[in-house]
Amino acid sequence: MRVDQAIAEILKREGVEQIFLFPFTPILEAVSAAGIRPIVARQERVAENMADGFSRVSNGKKIGTITVQQAAGAENAFAGIAQAYTDSSPVLFLPGGMNRMESGTPPSFNAVPNFRATTKWADQLLTADSLT
C-alpha cells in the first residue's frame, strides 16, 4: 500500500467526508477512490480557509482537512494554518511530500520544521507502514 492510499483509508475510517485541496496533490486520487469528496480551491490559502471555516461552523465536531502541493503549496498555506492554530480551530493539514532525495534541498520550503511552531504536531511520513 502506498502512503496516499493509507492516508485516504485512515481519513475514511475517521469519518472525513470531504477534503479541501489545491489540485494535483498525490492524495487527490486516493481520497476520491476511498469515497471522500475532494473540494478544489484555486489557491492554497483559500483551501485552508475553507477547511478552517468548516471546522468552525461544525463547532469542532468535524475537522476540516486540507492537502496542498509540496514546498510552495505548503508555504502558501502557512499563514492560514498559523491563524487556525492561534484561534484553536482544529484543522488537519496534509502537505504533499517530495522525493526523499530532494527533501530539504534549497530553495524548497521544508514544511516539517517550519510548521512545528504553528501546529500541535508536525512530522514527515516516509512509508505507509509508519501510519499503522
Per-region residue spans from a language model:
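N-terminal alpha/beta PP-like core and its mobile active-site loop of ThDP/TPP-dependent enzymes
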Residues: M1-T132
